[in-house]
């Protein structure tokens, strides 16, 4: 059995009258990427802060890298790299200086930090920007620098809160490629995200959250098979209620979201036959995704 990097058992957290994390339990094995997937307000960032000992749970137990959070979280933090949701780089320092200053927080000698900086710059693809001030960098470059900074102490575990929020598609894909590089070298990653594609591409397993409660847990493929398991046809245009009556006999399930119909079927051609000749309709046929799982679990309006 894989060594456990993170273990949560029955964790609860409230702020005032608001229950933010509701009896959450999960484990993360060493060397895997585990995702916390949920909308804003699902409790993802609070969970990340509790893992780091920055927020104290009201109930339950958290163990990180074999150390109980709270009593010995400072010891575990020495082997953890953190990528916060919003970059907190020193804008007046250069790229190189940001890495140098951050390394000192871990008690590293200046000589040691200078030894590792070139490899971190290469990893982040910032070699040509080493002496540029942070304020001169693009959003994607800043994010890669924040990731490189989190690796200054060669951590066993990376805790990443919404790592690609605000990035354009090219910058996002570059971050994903760098994270896959780290996973291939045995790092453990726990990340919070609301990007379905990010979770599907990176995560070995994930936990779907809503209002601090776990709705499902498993690999992306297993969750898709369990909760969807067939082709999806999105239908735009027309009267949704009229279309539901027409196609219901030919689908396993049909859901309505606004003016869009989501049909789940093993026989897409039958659906197309029934809708043939109807003006004003647009159809999109695609394989199921985590977004379908997420929307089903968290409450898209469902046609009974």
Swiss-Prot record:
InterPro entries from the xrefs? Answer: AAA+_ATPase, ABC_transporter-like_ATP-bd, ABC_transporter-like_CS, ABC_transporter_ATP-binding, ABC_transptNodI, P-loop_NTPase
Query: Membrane topology per the record?
Result: Peripheral membrane protein
Q: What is its EC number?
A: 7.6.2.-
All copies of the ABC transporter domain together span 6-236
Q: Name one GO cellular component term.
A: plasma membrane
Q: Name one Pfam family in it.
A: ABC_tran
User: Which enzyme class, named as a word?
Assistant: translocase
The disulfide bonds in this chain are none
Sorted keywords for this record are: ATP-binding, Cell inner membrane, Cell membrane, Membrane, Nodulation, Nucleotide-binding, Translocase, Transport
Which residues are recorded as binding ATP?
38-45
Q: Name one GO molecular function term.
A: ATP binding
Q: What is its main location?
A: membrane
Highest taxon of the lineage: Bacteria
The record ties this protein, via NCBIfam families, to:
nodI, PRK13536.1, PRK13537.1
Q: Which family does it belong to?
A: Belongs to the ABC transporter superfamily. Lipooligosaccharide exporter (TC 3.A.1.102) family.
- Record text on subunit structure and interactions: The complex is composed of two ATP-binding proteins (NodI) and two transmembrane proteins (NodJ).
Q: Any idea what job this protein has?
A: Part of the ABC transporter complex NodIJ involved in the export of the nodulation factors (Nod factors), the bacterial signal molecules that induce symbiosis and subsequent nodulation induction. Nod factors are LCO (lipo-chitin oligosaccharide), a modified beta-1,4-linked N-acetylglucosamine oligosaccharide. This subunit is responsible for energy coupling to the transport system.
> What's the protein here called?
Nod factor export ATP-binding protein I
């Amino acid at each position: 059995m894989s060594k456990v990097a993170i273990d949560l058992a029955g964790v609860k957290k409230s702020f005032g009258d608001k229950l933010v994390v509701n009896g959450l339990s999960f484990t993360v094995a060493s060397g895997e990427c585990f995702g916390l997937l949920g909308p804003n307000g699902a409790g993802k960032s609070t969970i990340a802060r509790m893992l780091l000992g920055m927020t104290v749970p009201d109930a339950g137990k958290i163990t990180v890298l074999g150390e109980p959070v709270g009593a010995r979280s400072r010891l575990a933090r020495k082997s953890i790299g953190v990528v916060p949701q919003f970059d907190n780089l020193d804008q007046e320092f250069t790229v190189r200086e940001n890495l140098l200053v951050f390394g000192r927080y871990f008690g590293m000698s200046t000589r040691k930090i200078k030894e590792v900086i070139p490899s971190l710059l290469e990893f982040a693809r910032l070699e040509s920007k080493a002496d540029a001030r942070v304020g001169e960098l693009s959003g994607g470059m800043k994010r890669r620098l924040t990731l490189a900074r989190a690796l200054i102490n060669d951590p066993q575990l990376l805790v990443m809160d919404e790592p690609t929020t605000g990035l354009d598609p090219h910058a996002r894909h570059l971050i994903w490629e760098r994270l896959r590089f780290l996973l291939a070298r045995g790092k453990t990653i726990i990340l919070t995200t609301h990007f379905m594609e990010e979770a599907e591409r990176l995560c070995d397993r994930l936990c779907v959250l809503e209002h601090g409660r776990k709705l499902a847990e498993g690999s992306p493929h297993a969750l898709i098979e369990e909760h969807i398991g067939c082709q999806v046809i999105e239908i735009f245009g027309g009267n949704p209620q009229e279309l539901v009556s027409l196609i219901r006999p030919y689908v396993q399930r049909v859901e309505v979201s606004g003016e869009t119909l989501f049909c789940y079927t093993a026989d897409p051609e039958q659906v197309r036959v029934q809708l043939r000749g109807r003006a004003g309709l647009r159809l999109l046929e695609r394989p199921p995704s985590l977004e379908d799982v997420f929307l089903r679990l968290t409450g898209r309006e469902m046609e009974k």
